[in-house]
Amino acid sequence: MTETETRSDGAAARTSLIGEEDEWIVREWIEREVGPVLSLEREGRWRPAWFVEVQGNDGPKRLFVRGARGGRWPARPLSYEAKVHRIFEEQGIKVPHLYGFIEEVPALVMDRVPGRPNISTAASEADRKKLLEQLADQMRLIHEIDPALIVEAGATMPVEPKAITFSAYRDAEGLYLDGDRRPSPDIEFVRKWLDRNVPPAIYDPCVIAMDAGQFIFKGDELTAMLDFELVCVGDRHADFSALRSRERVEGFDDPEGFYKLYEQRGGTPVDIDHVRFQHIAFSLYTPLQIANDLAHPRDQEDYHEYLIWHAISMKDALEGIAESMGVALAAYEMPAPARTQYLASVEALEVMAASLTLSDDFAAYRRDKIVLALQYLQKVELYRDAFAAEYISEVAELTGTRAASEEEASRQLEAFIAMAGPEHDEALLRVLHRQVKRQAMLLADEGTWLHQSLSTPLRPLNKD
């Protein structure tokens, strides 16, 4: 069964259970439009998606059905992504063949293309080099698509140079401003800094993927570009900034080298200062979109994952501002943990959740997420008093008023940011970065890739 709510763009957003009714709709659509369904399996993750095997005229074929996120984001509905996907396919971009769009679910039905993500897993440096060349070619082809086609699908066409720079960012900001949220001094500080420092675009607007660099490959062949829900018309430097975010875990360890490769393969020259600015805006994109969901959790949304996204993204945004300002941010030293009388209750719940009997991959996914959330709450219990005391004291030093709680401190800090001039930027940056690091350290165990991602400073971009 489903529910709907009104989104800021007037589209109906799915926000609740994806159940058997939806699977039957998917099955019936595929059997009507493609062929008899041999198997249909729900993917083990929060976003509704299915792996489907179909009997075709030339034998079995594999399909992938991708549902909507739910909630209030992204800014445009899944039907928009279907139109963009079709345009990309018609324009020669290497995408999975799209069979159609199931409006009732909603969902995209496409070929399941062989391949895997993460270029760091390429078998050799020679394979990696060929894959990067193909990615540069695909990005250039996307940037060369007539923007009018994407505007016709539902995007806006920015005209004024600063509007071009902010095109994609304003989409996410609109969701944030229209929604109900918790006090967010970190987001408010970055928003204000971006508005004060936005550079005018140096190129005409073009088609951009925004969440760029998502692809799968097999051997030395890029088999498909993926995920077009954020495609819009704007500044191409936004796409290059997205690759910087992929440096941490997806093998893009030389973004500057890729920018030169893009130019060598026919793309326009890349301006590093514009990439730096766009990376700050790109990093804020996700926190802007999920602020409402963090304040109001919904079923079928991965709350723990959203906390991780917020922490990583805000860390990158603040460290990007520090890079632009020439400010060196200090490492955060964790306080000593303090075990409370309530911790055993959370530990008991974790043991209980870990022992749950499972029926399928999706049930296993939900069980594992419950366990992760309970582990997070255990860390909250160990550090919350020390973290709160540190944060309240730091905010009081800035504002001159001592809050009674963390939430009150955040409200005071947000009000201070609204009135503060640029002379306070460095002090605010340090306080907010320390708070984001506290949030981040609650989400990851030492020795994990996540802990490394959250504790490793953003690598500066070099112009040479």
In which residue ranges do the predicted regions lie?
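Active-site activation/catalytic loop segments of kinase-like enzymes and analogous catalytic loops
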Residues: 237-270, 280-302, 309-324
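An alpha-helical support segment within catalytic cores of ATP-dependent transferases
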Residues: 17-33, 37, 145-213, 219
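Catalytic activation segment of kinase domains across protein kinase-like and atypical kinase folds
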Residues: 214-240
